[in-house]
Amino acid sequence: MITIFEALERVRVIPVVTLERVEDAVPLARALITGGIRCMEVTFRTLVAAEAIAAIRQECADVLLGAGTVLTVEQAQQAQAAGAQFVVSPGFNPRVVAHCLGHGVPIIPGIASATEIERALEFGISVVKFFPAELLGGTAMMSALARPYTAVRFVPTGGIHLNNLAEYVAHPRVLACGGSWMVPAQSIAAGDFSQVTALSQQTLQIVGVM
């Protein structure tokens, strides 16, 4: 059986989803699947996150499903109980990291510096979220951080879109790229899930070239 990280590397992209309504969760997941992407990260930026994760887990069992913007141990517990298979956080919170590792939940903590990479390595973590990627200097900064830490893989997120995705995916130390360009909030709000499918297909065309 492959690990979560191996599965993410095969997918190459992680749609970062913020849902305002639980009823949008399953149609959105199905739109991504139709577009060829069987992975998504539901953020805890809204109160319906855990319920949305549970709905997707029940109706779309083959989706690789993560919980994002996990800031507290309580949210990590809610994510796991709802069926999330991995956790992503914007920063490095040692309590959240320790909880996830202690309960067998893969976690991708956010880092923005060499110091935070070293903290991750102290916990035995070698896959980190480079966030916010573009504001921190993009692939140039990521390359600079990668050089001293040869075992670390990155999930760059923040400011990535169709026009710069190829540059990130081509980077040898990138495991997968996270972003919301495939799942625009206005399309979800309007129930225009066909747009999500179209953007997913465009994304895979770019990833497939690499």
Curated annotation (Swiss-Prot):
Give the positions of the site Plays a major role in determining the stereoselectivity: 157
UniProt xrefs under SUPFAM superfamilies: Aldolase
**What EC designation does it have?**
4.1.2.14
Task: Classify the main location.
Answer: cytoplasm
Is this entry keyworded Manganese?
no
The entry marks the following residues as binding pyruvate, namely 45, 69, 129
From the Swiss-Prot or TrEMBL record, state where the protein is found: Cytoplasm
**What pathway annotation does it carry?**
Carbohydrate acid metabolism; 2-dehydro-3-deoxy-D-gluconate degradation; D-glyceraldehyde 3-phosphate and pyruvate from 2-dehydro-3-deoxy-D-gluconate: step 2/2
Indicate the enzyme's highest-level EC class: lyase
**Catalysis performed (reactions):** 2-dehydro-3-deoxy-6-phospho-D-gluconate = D-glyceraldehyde 3-phosphate + pyruvate
Instruction: Report the domain of life of the source organism.
Output: Bacteria
Keywords assigned: Carbohydrate metabolism, Cytoplasm, Lyase, Schiff base
Quaternary structure and interacting proteins, as annotated: Homotrimer.
State what this protein does.
Catalyzes the reversible, stereospecific retro-aldol cleavage of 2-keto-3-deoxy-6-phosphogluconate (KDPG) to pyruvate and D-glyceraldehyde-3-phosphate.
- Which protein are we looking at? 2-dehydro-3-deoxy-phosphogluconate aldolase
